[in-house]
């Protein structure tokens, strides 16, 4: 390490495993931006379920060890590399991805994954945009190809992606139904775009949804936990309905006939299959939502960097989501 190189605190993962493999280090070198890269002084970083899958080694993304987790940071540009024209030191920004990892005091990011954070949103909200809103937008507009007037059920609507999906769906003229498992979660869902909300812990909640939507069924289901809900989802769909799988934590048995009779479809979505051009399209639509005011991230549990292990335990095992989980750096 060069003499005088600036150091920072960061979470490092030296082996794949449980939350306990997240190690806080205070002697990590601050990265230096290269061509088309920016260095961000991180104020907050989003914690996403995918972070835990990657950490455990069960995800198809397997970073070289050791690595620092974290995709969606919000902060202030500290330095820019060569050929960066869209940003300068001092700009407020958020990201959809980082190069060096977001669970750190500084994060390196490619300039095409960095976006201006409007003054009306604080850094906590900025850290809740990247993965949740871009994923929800891709699921609804790109994968499901929703149309105004259609109905959408957000199955697991009180977390980061769920709230984003409710807000986007309402803004685009859909009839929005959501589910949540706690009273607080249900309140948040109704406050953020849903016309109706159901408690998915109740034994008869599927019957209540069926009664609400009538014989036609639901046009689109945004599914956060497919290994639990997919079979029920197929029975809730309308003719030609679509289930978009955003999250799953295991396997499930389904009856393919349930798709045949309604000519329905199941489609998985992953944000990082998006092209640069698609990211630009998503960003333009979401930036408009920020300006108009319908895009307003809801912040849930907040943890200091040194509590990252607890955050990873809670995001998987909590009784019910209530907004986007974030790590605070400053």
From Swiss-Prot:
One Pfam family of this chain: ADH_N
Job description of the protein: Interacts with (AU)-rich elements (ARE) in the 3'-UTR of target mRNA species and enhances their stability. NADPH binding interferes with mRNA binding. Has minimal or no quinone reductase activity. Binds strongly to single-stranded DNA.
Protein family (similarity comment): Belongs to the zinc-containing alcohol dehydrogenase family. Quinone oxidoreductase subfamily.
Protein name from the UniProt record: Zeta-crystallin
Domain of life of the organism encoding this protein: Eukaryota
Gene responsible for this protein: CRYZ
Quaternary structure annotation from Swiss-Prot or TrEMBL: Homotetramer.
GO function term, MF aspect, one: DNA binding
GO BP term (any one): xenobiotic catabolic process
Chief localization: cytoplasm
Chain sites annotated for binding NADP(+): 53, 158-161, 200, 229, 246-249, 269-271
SMART domains in the cross-refs: PKS_ER
Modified positions (N-acetylalanine) in chain numbering: 2
Compartments where located: Cytoplasm
Biological source species: Bos taurus
UniProt GO cellular component terms: cytosol
Entry keyword set: Acetylation, Cytoplasm, DNA-binding, NADP, Phosphoprotein, RNA-binding
